[in-house]
UniProtKB/Swiss-Prot annotation:
The lineage of its organism: Bacteria, Pseudomonadati, Pseudomonadota, Alphaproteobacteria, Hyphomonadales. Belongs to the formate--tetrahydrofolate ligase family. Pathway: One-carbon metabolism; tetrahydrofolate interconversion. ATP binds at T65, P66, A67, G68, E69, G70, K71, T72. HAMAP family: FTHFS. This is Formate--tetrahydrofolate ligase. GO terms for biological process: tetrahydrofolate interconversion. The gene is fhs. It is an enzyme of class 6 (ligase).
Length: 556
């Protein structure tokens, strides 16, 4: 079979105006970026308010292998399949980050015959949203330094400044740096660092804002540091909000592209799920629900991260409630969770598969605890045997969970029609009764412990007195009602990436907490997770190049 990029390059794309018409967007409400991508105008979004609301389908997964388990591919295949069976469906995905594209994972536009296009554009610069978000974030950094340099009011202490810089690249050498060297004319020396753009609070704010007014209000609430009296200083205090909004004027609008089968897809925002909240924008999801009968969206990494945050953060803030959840599982990941080495995942091992099924069972139980009906999607690989597939199907049937074998990578939407029928049947039963994991008024540390014990099955949360005092101070300052955003490894229920399967009684080490007052959550950084990733020993960038025709090769 051809490579992903070769398949995408051969796609028979329709003009974006035709794709927009399928989604009910008129030409005057379309802002084209070339022939195959566009933004949807604010006027169109505002005019959707009185439309009926569609059904929301969340796609999530078990804990993944480093290569991912095809969650995005399954989301695309499902949306194509639902349109094939006559269910008017819109797809909502996140924008890829350059870091993983050039790092370990590669692109994030699906694979095989389940892709969104234009693949190269979406994976790289797209419509410039990430550039705008990075620029807005770093403009605030610059204005903070300038405020300190000129002694502006309120008096912000350099040592109490908490705002770091960002860039959309994996670069471990920038995690911790000293800036302002070279004498008084070059700023005040201070320890700081860079995070990846997808971990930026500006990214989270853009993805959680309901409209331009809410976006500006959230930006204004960003806390950048404190005075000597420990009074919070915000982006509004240093008069940065207006200029940040100017940079984000176009980035706040959802992007429209198409699948290989010419179905419309909104791609907007891209926070990581292991170090941020891992969901596409509220504006895109809310708009899609007013534009189609069904909306398929995904949450990053496994259900312990992306889905937990989708349900406890995004749904809580935006008033959303999924009608069904698709849990993607692969035979190879289950065997890895059962103890098989990553180089042996193509080998048959019923013992490893049976042991690894506990990971799937844990995720099913967790999702059901939110009051949501679940269907398991088996993303089939060519190395899967009939016996292994039957063993997985039997396990799901034993738990009373519907299961569907999917071959969308090889067959596109046709290979996921059974899943599409299963999802619509599940929704028609009306069994969804969504409820978040914890109430707003629960203390912050207790919220962290609730996620750790209920979702991760940890025995306890271990942290420092400084972290406890910081959480107590934020509660006293009026932030105790906020949800928590757990930052931890995506490979395990625990904070140890090597502890696979379904561990219980482990210790979650809470190392640091950060207040994202504008986004509206408290980040709990656990274990050794980094908010600026590094490149692997053999980064994907080594294999990416331009051919003699000026086409990009190696981007998968």
């Amino acid at each position: 079979m051809a490579s992903d990029i070769e398949i995408a390059r051969g796609a028979k794309k329709k003009p974006i105006q035709e794709v927009a018409a399928r989604a009910g967007v008129s030409p005057e409400n379309l802002i084209p970026y070339g022939h195959d991508k566009a933004k949807i105008s604010a006027a169109h979004l505002a005019g959707l308010a009185h439309n009926a609301t569609g059904k929301l389908i969340l796609v999530t997964a078990i804990n993944p292998t480093p290569a991912g388990e095809g969650k995005t591919t399954t989301s695309i295949g499902l949306a194509d399949a639902m349109n094939r069976i006559g269910a008017n469906t819109l797809l909502c995905l996140r924008e890829p980050s350059l870091g993983p594209c050039f790092g370990m994972k590669g692109g994030a536009t699906g694979g095989g015959l389940a892709q969104i296009v234009p693949m190269e554009d979406i994976n790289l610069h797209f419509t410039g949203d990430f550039h705008a978000i990075t620029s807005a974030h770093n403009l605030l950094s610059t204005m903070i330094d300038n405020h300190i340099h000129w002694g502006g009011e309120p008096k912000l202490e350099a040592v109490r400044t908490s705002w770091r810089r960002v860039m959309d690249m994996n670069d471990r050498s920038l995690r911790n740096i000293v800036s302002g060297l070279g004498g008084p004319g070059n700023g005040s020396p201070s320890e700081t660092g860079f995070d990846i753009t997808v971990a930026s609070e500006v990214m989270a704010i853009l993805c959680l804002a309901t409209d331009a007014e809410d976006l500006e209000a959230r930006l204004a609430r960003i806390i950048v540091g404190y005075t000597s009296e420990k009074e919070a200083v915000t982006a509004a205090d240093i008069k940065a909000t207006g200029a940040m909004m100017a940079l984000l004027r176009d980035a706040m609008l959802p992007n429209l592209v198409q699948t290989l089968e010419n179905n419309p897809c909104l791609v907007h925002g891209g926070p990581f799920a292991n170090i941020a909240h891992g969901c596409n924008s509220v504006m895109a999801t809310s708009a899609a629900l007013k534009m189609a009968d069904y909306v398929v969206t995904e949450a990053g990494f496994g259900a312990d991260l992306g889905a937990e945050k989708f349900l406890n953060i995004k749904c809580r803030q935006a008033g959303l409630a999924p009608d069904a959840v698709v849990l993607v599982a692969t035979i190879r990941a289950l065997k890895m969770h059962g103890g098989l080495g990553k180089n042996d995942l193509g080998k048959v091992s019923y013992e490893a598969l049976e042991s690894g099924l506990e990971n799937l069972g844990r995720h099913i139980g967790n999702l059901r605890s939110f009051g949501l009906p679940v269907i398991v999607a088996i993303n089939r690989f060519t190395t899967d045997t009939e016996g292994e597939v039957h063993a997985l199907q039997a396990y799901c049937e034993k738990l009373g969970v519907p299961v569907s074998l999917c071959t969308h990578w090889a067959e596109g939407g046709k290979g996921t029609e059974d899943l599409a029928r299963g999802v619509t049947a599940l929704i028609e039963k009306g069994e969804a009764d969504f409820k978040p994991l914890y109430p707003d008024d629960m203390p912050l540390l207790e919220k962290i412990e609730t996620v750790a014990k209920s979702i991760y099955r940890a025995g306890r949360v271990e942290t420092t007195r400084a972290v406890r005092n910081q959480l107590a101070a934020w509660e006293k300052a009026g932030f105790g009602h906020l949800p928590v955003c757990m930052a931890k490894t995506q490979y395990s229920f625990s904070t140890d990436p090597a502890l696979l399967g379904a561990p219980e009684g482990h210790v979650v080490r809470l190392r640091e907490v950060r207040l994202a007052a504008g986004a509206g959550f408290v980040v709990a950084i656990c274990g050794d997770i980094m908010t600026m990733p590094g490149l692997p020993r053999r980064p994907a960038a080594e294999h990416i190049h331009l051919n003699r025709q000026g086409q990009i090769e190696g981007l998968n």
